[in-house]
Amino acid sequence: MNKLTIVGAGLVGEAAAQIIARDELCRELVLMDVQGELAQGKALDVWQAAVESGSDTRVYGGAKAEMLDGSDLVVITAGVPRKPGQSRQDVLSINLPILDGIMTDIKHHAPAATVLVVSNPVDVLTYRAWSVSGLGRDKVFGQAGVLDTARMKCFIAEQTGFSAKDITALVLGGHGDSMVPLMRYCQIGSVPLSHFLSSEQIEQIVERTRKGGGEILGLKKMGSACDAPGVAIAQMVDAIANGRNRILPAVAILQGEYGRKDIAMGVPCVLADEGLARVIELPLDAQEQAMFDQSADQVARDIDEMKAL
C-alpha cells in the first residue's frame, strides 16, 4: 500500500500508527488531527521509533485536509472518547458532526480511498460514513469484532489456563452490550469450549466480553482502551495492504445476510486488497438468530436516532 492516513491522533490512532509504521504496512503514513502540532509531534515520534525498528515507512502529521490527497486507505479514529458511566451512544451527538466533516474531506481529497471507521458508536458511524460516501460496502466498513474477539480470548485463557494462541472465538452483532458471542464456535485446540467450562462460567465470560471496554475505562479512570484497539486496526490494515484474504470480523453493511438489510453490523468478513471482499453468512440456530435480531433491532434504533440529529 502506498499511502495510509489516520484521522485522529489520539491514543488509539497513535497506537495503530506505531504498529503500522513498524511493520511497514504502507510506504507513507499520515497522522491527521485538528490539533496539527500534536499530530506533527506524534508522527515524528512514531517515525523515529519505526526507523529504530528498521522500517522505511515515512510518517508525518498535521491538520490540513489536503494531507488526505492520494490516500489508499483512511482510518477514522477521531472523536471524543468515552468517560466513566457513558455508553457509546452518549458520545454520538458529539462524534457524528466530526465524522461528517471528515467524510466531506475524504470525498474532496481521496474519493477512491477505502474507509475504516473506528470511532464510537462504531456501528452507527460506519453506517453514516457509508451512506454519505456514495461508495459500496466493500470500501466502507468498521472495526469492532477483532477487538471484541481478542477480549473474549483473553478471558477464556484466564479462566482455563490454556494458551490464548490455541483459542478461537467469534463475536457478531453490535459493538457493546448487544454483541452476540457465538460460543458454539469457540474452541480450544479444536475442542469445544463447553468441554472445559460450565454453562455458568461461559456466561460469565460472555458478559465480561460485552462489558470489556467499560471495565478498562473504569479501571483507567482517565482514558479508554487504546493499545488493543490499535492492534486490531493494524490487523485489518495488514489484511488489506497485503491482500491476505483473511477472515476477520468487521462492521459491514448487510444486504440481506442474516435476514437484515440497510444496517451496519459486526459479522465475519473476508478482507483483501480491494477492502471488504465479502460477508460470510454463518448458519445460526434459533437462539443465536434471536440474539442477533435483538442486537440488530438495537442498532437500527440507534441509526434512527442518528438520522434524527
UniProtKB/Swiss-Prot annotation:
Binding site for substrate: 82, 88, 120, 151
Binding annotation for NAD(+): 8-13, 33, 95, 118-120
Pfam families referenced in this protein's UniProt entry, alphabetically: Ldh_1_C, Ldh_1_N
Catalyzed reaction equations: (S)-malate + NAD(+) = oxaloacetate + NADH + H(+)
Enzyme Commission number: 1.1.1.37
One MF annotation (Gene Ontology) recorded for this entry: L-malate dehydrogenase (NAD+) activity
InterPro entries, per the entry: L-lactate/malate_DH, Lactate/malate_DH_C, Lactate/malate_DH_N, Lactate_DH/Glyco_Ohase_4_C, Malate_DH_type3, NAD(P)-bd_dom_sf
Active site (record annotation): 175
Keywords: NAD, Oxidoreductase, Tricarboxylic acid cycle
Any GO BP: tricarboxylic acid cycle
Family from the record: Belongs to the LDH/MDH superfamily. MDH type 3 family.
Function: Catalyzes the reversible oxidation of malate to oxaloacetate.
Name recorded for this polypeptide: Malate dehydrogenase
Native source species: Pseudomonas putida (strain GB-1)
Gene: mdh
